[in-house]
């Protein structure tokens, strides 16, 4: 008997499988392979019938009022309370009392007896300030007959006003001392500016005395001396050295405060400007101070030459 080839073996296996499938054993064999043959679980979903205990323990909802409303063509939803209108009695509130109560709550000084007295807490505070405004330090303490307005602004405005209280103090003695300190700093600033101005004037006048003779004195002929350009070179060199030194000086000196237009704008609206742009504007204000000083020095030179040309000396 000859051995079967591989193709014949595969053919016999296919025929056996077809015979098994034709006998209906394919589904059982598939379940055996997938492991579902020994599963005891049922695919039917049992329906749960309510027990007697559940029906007896359930809370019965009142339906008599609901049926009455439905029969009377009422909307049952209208009986549900609105959280937004809770506590609203239908009367229009007084706007002044509403604003005063909002300020009192934000300041944390609610006075339950203020409504009984007829005067809100906020109004009493302002009236006390006005009553004590003519005595003492403009009503800055209890001794002056009023209250400290910084305390009021701090309670209403928050941390930004608190910085002002830290700067000026909370007691009359601290306020008076800090006022004197601020006035002293302003005086020192003015003295410093005066010294800088004197130094500039001395340098410019000395330069004009030494080099100004060689410069032309006539504004009509516009003639120049042979070494007249040396004055401008020395003047610009000294200005460059002076302006550079002054820039580093005013950057490190806290007592020096400039009165430029940019600084005034920063003092007014600095809180609304981002920190990056605020630093750039502060640097620009220093350059503006230097530019104004240079223009002032140049104007002195022009005025001196104009006077010499006019009087011809």
Curated annotation (Swiss-Prot):
Q: Where in the cell is it found?
A: Endoplasmic reticulum membrane; Golgi apparatus membrane
Name of one Pfam family that matches: GET2
Identify the residue ranges that face the Lumenal compartment according to the record. Answer: 213-230, 311-313
Q: Which UniProt keywords apply?
A: Endoplasmic reticulum, ER-Golgi transport, Golgi apparatus, Membrane, Transmembrane, Transmembrane helix, Transport
Indicate where this protein is primarily found.
endoplasmic reticulum
Single biological process term from Gene Ontology? retrograde vesicle-mediated transport, Golgi to endoplasmic reticulum
Q: Specify the protein name.
A: Golgi to ER traffic protein 2
Q: Which organism does this sequence originate in?
A: Komagataella phaffii (strain GS115 / ATCC 20864) (Yeast)
Biological classification of the source = Eukaryota, Fungi, Dikarya, Ascomycota, Saccharomycotina
């Amino acid at each position: 008997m000859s051995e079967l080839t591989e193709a014949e073996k595969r053919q016999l296996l296919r025929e056996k499988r077809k015979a098994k499938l034709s006998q209906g054993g394919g589904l059982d064999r598939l379940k055996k392979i997938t492991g579902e043959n020994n599963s005891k679980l049922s695919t039917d979903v049992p329906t749960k019938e309510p027990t007697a205990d559940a029906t007896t323990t359930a809370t019965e909802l009142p339906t008599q009022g609901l049926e009455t409303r439905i029969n009377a063509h009422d909307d049952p939803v209208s009986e549900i309370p609105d959280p937004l209108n809770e506590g609203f009695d239908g009367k229009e509130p007084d706007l002044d009392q509403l604003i005063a109560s909002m300020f009192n709550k934000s300041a944390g000084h609610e006075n339950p007896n203020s409504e009984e007295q007829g005067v809100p807490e906020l109004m009493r505070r302002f009236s006390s300030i006005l009553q004590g405004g003519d005595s003492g330090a403009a009503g800055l303490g209890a001794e002056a007959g009023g209250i400290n307005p910084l305390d009021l602004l701090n309670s209403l405005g928050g941390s930004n006003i608190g910085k002002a209280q830290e700067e000026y103090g909370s007691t009359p003695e601290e306020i008076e001392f800090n006022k004197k300190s601020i006035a002293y700093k302003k005086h020192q600033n003015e003295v410093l500016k005066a010294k800088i101005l004197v130094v500039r004037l001395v340098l410019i006048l000395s330069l004009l005395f030494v080099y100004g003779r060689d410069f032309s004195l006539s504004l009509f002929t516009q003639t120049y001396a042979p070494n007249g350009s040396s004055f401008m070179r020395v003047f610009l060199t000294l200005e460059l050295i002076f302006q550079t030194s002054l820039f580093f000086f005013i950057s490190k000196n806290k007592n020096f405060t400039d009165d430029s237009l940019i600084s005034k704008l920063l003092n007014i609206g600095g809180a609304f400007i981002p920190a990056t742009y605020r630093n750039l504007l502060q640097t620009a204000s220093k350059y503006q101070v230097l530019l104004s000083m240079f223009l002032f020095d140049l104007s002195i030179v022009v005025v001196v030459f104009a006077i010499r040309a006019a009087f011809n000396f």
